[in-house]
């Protein structure tokens, strides 16, 4: 425990005790969930299967169904609960149906966005009607080791408040059974002293969870996502921090300041009370900051800094912000600063957003946070990655922006590009040279949708579904690895493919010669074991 002197700023350690929880945790164990095959067959014959979908992970979860069609229903439920508590009722007096969501409940909805993440962390099982194995629900479920069944067409027909069991331990199909179903949990140990040629890294996005994940036998972080910090820790659109003074001026005078003119149409359609609410919310959170942008920078650098510190000195590859416009619109103030796009997945995102004069001030706050992590915190294991970079010229301009702030390649910060577009593969040599790259990381999620021209959020709706195992994607991955290795640069993969297919995909990657594989924490041990076997077979 520590205390800081409010006058002098001195920091005092006032108490220290041996840590007894995480130090005893064993990182060389793999948990396997099993449901008896005869029992599963019997349940199917009895008609106990309420719904099916794509299984995410290999676990089993059971709990009470809490069905919400939209996140606004969650917010309304919270408001009603608050009224009951303010009237003098205690939580013990309030029925569980009015509690909104309790630890261990089963979350059922159409499709999740970052807004849902606080509820998702408490769930024993997540079921969505839409989405595939690379959807938001699947990615977050994997990171927290929560079973999920996505693309479940009958999800919204599940009986609310009923007890169900969701099994992802029976192959690619996830089954939702009625009532509680018995299952077994088995722990398997492995030898973590085996040295691998291929580095195994983690995909992380939740700073506090990285303290636990860092105990796993991995070589660092191959993908650190900052979107959770933006949505849950801040929850306000970054441009609202930039334009705080002008927003306040608009609320007070009713006249639109020059700095907000690019968003004139949004203000015409907005209720001034919504803008007032945005300003009040921002000021209540940033009351201690004269310049409201400093709150954004502080929260971002603290979150990224925690991840870097947890894994230090192992490298942490931080992907610069990659929210799409529809995701930014979910943040407070998002409807003012974001357009409504037909297909946000392939529109205003990644590098093109950073360079846009409208968004550039927000990206500059991001740069300031990263610079502080490296220089103020001294965490020199920070690496940066540019996502959704369409052309080498675009990549060079982003690199130049980083260089101007002493956080680019010339100042010793490793720069990577997310290899997720056909152009990244076709012009790989130019990307490497013009961006002075230290390496690349294959984003198989977006690579599938850009190679096959399909929306990754709706893959389950296609007659002939494709994924990272499909021939064109595998051919492109092999070509990407060859080009990066020819220049002696690191080339890894951070998409969901190795996590979704831990027995099948890593051997293919090793055959390609990939240098690192980054996976979700729940599959790290299984992938490590698969890689060890594949390397032994290949005499690596």
Feature-to-residue mapping (PLM):
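Non-catalytic terminal/interface segments that mediate subunit docking, oligomerization
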Residues: 29-110, 332-349, 353, 358-371, ...
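Amphipathic alpha-helical
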Residues: 18-60, 391-415
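A short, conserved beta-strand element enriched in hydrophobic/aromatic residues
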Residues: 13-14, 386
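ATP-grasp fold ATP-binding core
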Residues: 1, 164, 318
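A short glycine-rich, hydrophobically flanked beta-strand micro-motif that places a catalytic Asp/Glu
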Residues: 1-6, 492-496
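Phosphate-binding site of ATP-dependent enzymes
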Residues: 5-11, 420
């Amino acid at each position: 425990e520590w205390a800081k002197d409010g006058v002098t700023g001195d920091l005092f350690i006032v108490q220290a005790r041996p840590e007894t929880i995480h130090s005893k945790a064993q990182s060389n164990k793999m948990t396997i969930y099993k449901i008896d095959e005869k029992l599963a067959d019997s349940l199917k014959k009895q008609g106990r299967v309420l719904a099916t979908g794509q299984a995410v992970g290999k676990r089993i979860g059971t709990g009470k169904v809490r069905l919400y069609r939209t996140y606004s229903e969650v917010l309304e439920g919270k408001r009603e609960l608050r009224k009951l508590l303010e009237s003098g009722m205690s939580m013990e007096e309030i029925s569980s149906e009015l509690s909104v969501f309790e630890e261990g409940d089963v979350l059922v909805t159409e499709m999740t966005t970052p807004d849902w993440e606080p509820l998702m962390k408490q769930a024993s099982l997540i079921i969505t009607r839409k989405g595939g194995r690379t959807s938001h629900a699947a990615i977050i479920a994997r990171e927290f080791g929560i079973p999920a069944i996505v693309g479940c067409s009958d999800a919204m027909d599940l009986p609310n408040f009923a007890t169900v069991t969701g099994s992802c331990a029976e192959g690619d199909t996830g089954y939702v059974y009625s009532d509680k179903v018995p299952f077994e949990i088995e722990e398997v140990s492995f030898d973590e002293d085996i040295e691998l040629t291929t580095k195994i890294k983690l995909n992380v996005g939740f700073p506090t969870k990285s303290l636990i994940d860092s105990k796993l036998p991995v070589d660092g972080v191959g993908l650190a996502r900052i979107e959770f910090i933006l949505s849950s820790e801040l929850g306000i659109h970054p441009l609202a921090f930039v334009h705080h003074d002008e927003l306040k001026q608009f609320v007070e005078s009713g006249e639109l300041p020059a700095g907000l003119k690019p968003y004139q149409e949004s203000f015409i359609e907005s209720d001034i009370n919504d803008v007032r609410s945005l300003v009040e919310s921002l000021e209540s959170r940033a009351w201690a900051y004269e310049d409201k942008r400093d709150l954004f920078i502080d929260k971002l650098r603290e979150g990224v800094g925690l991840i870097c510190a947890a894994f230090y000195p192992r490298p942490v590859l931080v992907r610069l912000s990659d929210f799409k416009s529809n995701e930014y619109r979910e943040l407070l103030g998002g409807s003012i600063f974001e357009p409504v796009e037909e297909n946000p997945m392939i529109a205003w995102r990644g590098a093109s957003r950073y360079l846009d004069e409208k968004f550039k001030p927000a990206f500059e706050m991001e740069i300031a946070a990263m610079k502080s992590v490296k220089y103020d915190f001294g965490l020199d294991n920070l690496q940066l990655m540019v996502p959704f970079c369409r052309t080498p010229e675009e990549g060079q301009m982003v690199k130049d922006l980083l260089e101007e702030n002493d956080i680019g390649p010339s100042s010793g910060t490793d720069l990577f590009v997310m290899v997720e577009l056909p152009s990244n593969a076709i012009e790989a040599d130019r990307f490497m040279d013009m961006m002075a790259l230290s390496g690349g990381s294959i984003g198989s999620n977006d690579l599938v949708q850009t190679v096959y021209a399909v929306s990754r959020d709706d893959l389950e709706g296609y007659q002939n579904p494709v994924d990272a195992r499909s021939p064109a994607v595998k051919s492109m991955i092999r070509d990407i690895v060859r080009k990066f290795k020819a220049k002696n640069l690191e080339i890894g993969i951070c998409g969901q493919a190795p996590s979704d297919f831990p027995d099948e995909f890593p051997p293919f990657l090793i055959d390609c010669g990939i240098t690192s594989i980054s996976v979700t924490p729940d599959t790290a041990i299984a992938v490590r074991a698969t890689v060890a076997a594949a390397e032994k077979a290949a005499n690596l």
